[in-house]
Curated annotation (Swiss-Prot):
Its main location: cytoplasm. CDD domains: Argininosuccinate_lyase. Its EC number is 4.3.2.1. Gene3D superfamilies: Fumarase/aspartase (C-terminal domain), Fumarase/aspartase (Central domain), Fumarase/aspartase (N-terminal domain). NCBIfam families: argH. Residues 440-459 are annotated as: Disordered. It comes from Pyrococcus furiosus (strain ATCC 43587 / DSM 3638 / JCM 8422 / Vc1). Pathway: Amino-acid biosynthesis; L-arginine biosynthesis; L-arginine from L-ornithine and carbamoyl phosphate: step 3/3. GO terms for biological process: arginine biosynthetic process via ornithine; L-arginine biosynthetic process. This is Argininosuccinate lyase. It catalyses: 2-(N(omega)-L-arginino)succinate = fumarate + L-arginine. GO terms for cellular component: cytosol.
Length: 459
């Protein structure tokens, strides 16, 4: 359609090579929303006859319910397909639509809407995950477990303390996601192809239908994908955090550890070995983080060193962004379900606390403080005693005999510093965590209410 007057038709194989129609399935809803805002802006500024504008709005609203019809049209992209559709449906009236509009400002508008919706959904799912973690932590404040460095038993803790670390990380990620929305939630409508338009559009009015602000500079509005890279980076950040939890859960669910039992729906068996219970959802989540990083690297590789202004290279970025949003949201849903229903084996956790000399640091610190001797000197003595014995019981027995002190696991977790596994500290943290969830839920609800703007045509 666009090329006909200047270039004539092209071959189908070439059209297929440059077309983004399949990828545009992901943003067809957002493209229509942007067009509705644009037409409302044209009517508002009295740039087209109101009656004709209302016909276009009605047709666009009807198109929302029958979007699949667009994908039988031969077109470079969804924007061209919609214009072809409107021309066939409305005749000349459809020709009012593109006044003051370019695909360049409209694809950015659609991508920003898509990214905004993805961030909002990610925040909502992270809030669900935080609530599930808090509930599970409250049930396990006194559930002893070893913590690990280098995957070696390190110090005594509780399962609640372990989960609290995840909760606090997700709180920080939530803050970053809210911050990201401030960057994404801006309108490009009215920026034209690159240098604006001579049509006197009210950019603030159009932008206010879908966004909370506008991008001022028309070149930046149409040719930058920083907003998309940033929102995709946030999806990668989430995915990496989840992959580390997934790795822990894969390890903790093995018979060798036996700390947790994942829901049966999250497990798969072997085609040959009837005893196998494989933690497949966690394995896929672990792999997804690698894929997510790959998508982000592909996006950055495409965008780096592009000249200013729109280039069709940018079209190739979109499929990676869509995959990132979709994959991260799916993975979050898996974790919400798994965390709600995971079972904890307190006996196995406690058993490993007894088997390994994870109180060694507590002994060394207490001896140093009791005697006033340099810690490194005491550390060396404790390490030597550990090296002489295979049995944890014998290690503790000699330390107690030699230095006249005895430390239990329960004492070992009751450390005086803030943020330790001390049950009092953990309970206090969990109370704050619940309040933080409530604050973030309120913030998200306010954001969703603000998004419930009248961007739907009501004849």
């Amino acid at each position: 359609m666009y090329r006909k007057a200047l270039l004539g038709s092209t071959r189908l194989d070439i059209l297929s090579y440059i077309s983004s129609m399949e990828e545009d399935r992901e943003i067809v809803e957002e493209v229509i929303e942007c067009l509705i805002a644009h037409v409302k802006g044209l009517i508002h500024s009295k740039l087209i006859p109101e009656e004709e504008g209302e016909k276009i709005l009605k047709a666009l609203e009807e198109l929302r319910a029958s979007k699949e019809a667009l994908f039988s049209i031969e077109a470079e992209d969804i924007h061209e397909a919609i214009e072809i559709y409107l021309k066939e449906k409305l005749g000349k009236t459809g020709g009012y639509l593109p006044l003051g509009r370019s695909r360049n400002d409209h694809v950015v508008c659609a991508l920003r809407l898509k990214a905004k919706k993805a961030l909002v959904e990610e925040i909502g799912l992270i809030l669900e995950l935080r609530k599930a973690l808090i509930k599970k932590a409250e049930e396990n404040v006194y559930t002893l477990m070893p913590l690990f460095t280098h995957l070696q038993p390190a110090q005594p803790s509780t399962f609640a303390h372990y989960l609290s670390a995840i909760i606090e990380e997700l709180e920080d990620i939530t803050k970053i996601l809210f911050s990201g929305l401030g960057i994404v939630d801006k309108s490009s409508l009215g920026a034209g192809a690159i240098g604006g338009t001579s049509v006197l559009l009210d950019r603030g009015y159009m932008g206010g239908i879908l966004f909370s602000d506008i991008i001022t500079n028309s070149l930046y509005a149409t040719s930058s994908r920083t907003f998309l890279l940033y929102s995709c980076f946030l999806s990668v950040l989430i995915s990496i955090a989840l992959s580390r939890i997934a790795e822990d859960f894969v390890i903790f669910s093995t018979p060798n550890f036996g700390y947790i039992k994942l829901p049966n729906e999250h497990l798969s068996t072997s085609s040959m070995m009837p005893q196998k219970k494989n933690p497949v959802t966690m394995e896929v989540a672990r792999a997804w983080a690698g894929e997510a990083i790959g998508h982000l690297v592909a996006m950055m590789s495409i965008l780096k060193a592009l000249p200013s202004g729109y280039n069709l290279d940018m079209q190739e970025v979109n499929k990676h962004a869509f995959a990132l949003f979709s994959g991260t949201i799916k993975t979050l849903k898996i974790f919400v379900d798994a965390m709600k229903r995971v079972e904890v084996n307190k006996e196995n956790m406690k058993k490993d606390c007894d088997i390994f000399p994870i109180l060694a640091t507590d002994y060394a610190e207490k001896i140093a403080m009791n005697t006033g001797r340099p810690y490194r000197e005491v550390y060396m003595e404790v390490a030597s005693i550990i090296g002489e014995h295979e049995s944890t019981e014998k290690i503790y027995s000699e330390l107690s005999s030699k230095y006249g002190i005895s430390i239990s696991l329960e004492e070992g977790i009751k450390k005086p510093v803030v943020g330790s596994p001390n049950p009092e500290d953990v309970l206090e943290f969990l109370e704050k965590a619940k309040k933080n969830v409530e604050k973030d839920e309120k913030k998200l609800e306010e954001l969703r209410q603000n998004e419930n703007r009248d961007n739907v045509y009501n004849p």
